[in-house]
């Protein structure tokens, strides 16, 4: 522990917090343009074709971001909204594309966790029709 004289001569260093998503530059999300949309394979124990996109952000960063959900409508020059959040089994993928925002469509026929995939609530007419038949 330093003495008072040592603290007078040289004050304590401030702890610098390192962000896990530097390309967002202190913003919750950033807009960007897809420069390449492709699939890639995950790390060792897992096996799949994960959909990812290389995105040029408004902050001038070029990042690789994951496209969540089943199926997507993204192609080159699509405008997307990017949020933080890495994908554990894809090295170098530290961002997610927000579904249902800007050019990205929501996931079709999604019933559970719809808010995460930009899906509107299904029409309740089907449910009422089945309930009336039961009575």
Curated annotation (Swiss-Prot):
Residues covered by region (Disordered): 108-135
Gene3D superfamilies, A to Z: Nucleic acid-binding proteins
UniProt feature, compositional bias: Basic and acidic residues: 123-135
GO MF terms held by the record: rRNA binding; structural constituent of ribosome; tRNA binding
One GO CC term, this protein: small ribosomal subunit
Compositionally biased tracts (Basic residues): 111-122
GO biological process: translation
Annotated keywords: Methylation, Ribonucleoprotein, Ribosomal protein, RNA-binding, rRNA-binding, tRNA-binding
PTM-bearing positions, type 3-methylthioaspartic acid: 89
Xref: HAMAP family: Ribosomal_uS12_B
Function statement: With S4 and S5 plays an important role in translational accuracy. Interacts with and stabilizes bases of the 16S rRNA that are involved in tRNA selection in the A site and with the mRNA backbone. Located at the interface of the 30S and 50S subunits, it traverses the body of the 30S subunit contacting proteins on the other side and probably holding the rRNA structure together. The combined cluster of proteins S8, S12 and S17 appears to hold together the shoulder and platform of the 30S subunit.
Family (UniProt): Belongs to the universal ribosomal protein uS12 family.
Assembly, per entry: Part of the 30S ribosomal subunit. Contacts proteins S8 and S17. May interact with IF1 in the 30S initiation complex.
Name by which UniProt lists this protein: Small ribosomal subunit protein uS12
Protein source organism: Helicobacter pylori (strain HPAG1)
Lineage, top ranks: Bacteria, Pseudomonadati, Campylobacterota, Epsilonproteobacteria, Campylobacterales
Primary gene name: rpsL
